[in-house]
Amino acid sequence: STYFDWVHYTESQRQREDTILKALLREIWQNNYKAYGAPRLRLALSDLNLHHGTNQVRRLMREASIYSVMTRRFNKPTTTVDYRQRPNLIRHLPEANAWSMDITYLKLSNGQWVYLASVLDLQTRKILAHQISATMDTKLVVTTLQRSLSTDKKPNYLHTDMASQFTSFGFENLLKRHKIDHSYSKLGHPYDNAKIESFHSLLKCEMIYQFRFPSIAHLILDVSKYIHWFNNERISLANPKIKVA
């Protein structure tokens, strides 16, 4: 019947459109470290002037076996702090001109630990500098911060935890020379430095755990590529017009 033919045609047309959308979603997903779930993929389609609901995108993802990568945990080496608590100067200053800095552990294919130091602008949420080293020492954090200070307007505050690298004479002296006040997380409260911790978690979830790194050189290259993507292309759910997490 004419009605049957119309229904059959409509379904076939929808199937063809779904097939095209699935291919496009897969391309966007693969080009963004397989990091995007339905909300970010929907926004990516909107950037292409293709407007579809989150539920539809979620259905197409499920049918195409497209899944956002998931976080997994690992047990990292621990460090000790032998200093008294120092003040958190930015706790009640959410709009302060402040940077945050932290060190995280990354593992090569052979099981060797290496160390990534990163500096985050707390206002723009962008990574200003980073460095990877086989040793977790004062030189790592000093040279990483110097990179930030050489290319960006200096902050009023720098917030870190109380690891020995950040309380070392060399690091504290660098801050004093640049007239930057040092703010510290409370001992045993890593969430005081949540934004830089969140970035390192995203890095591991969205990139590190998907690949193997036979050498520190391979890791340095891939982390640099990821950070460029994070700063310039990653879709923000908080503000979709801003391409940063």
Question: What are the functions of these language-model segments?
Answer:
Residues 2-96, 189, 244-245:
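Basic, flexible linker segments flanking DNA-binding modules
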Residues 11, 23, 176-180, 202-245:
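C-terminal domain-tail junction helix/linker
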Residues 68, 181-182:
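Hydrophobic beta-strand scaffold residues
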Residues 77-81, 160-162, 168-172, 182-204, ...:
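RNase H-like two-metal-ion nuclease catalytic core shared by retroviral integrases
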Residues 95-128, 134-135:
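An active-site-proximal beta-strand-loop segment
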Residues 112, 130-152, 167:
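Active-site beta-loop-alpha junctions of metal-dependent nucleic acid enzymes
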Residues 145, 152-167, 240-243:
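Acidic/histidine-rich, metal-coordinating catalytic segments
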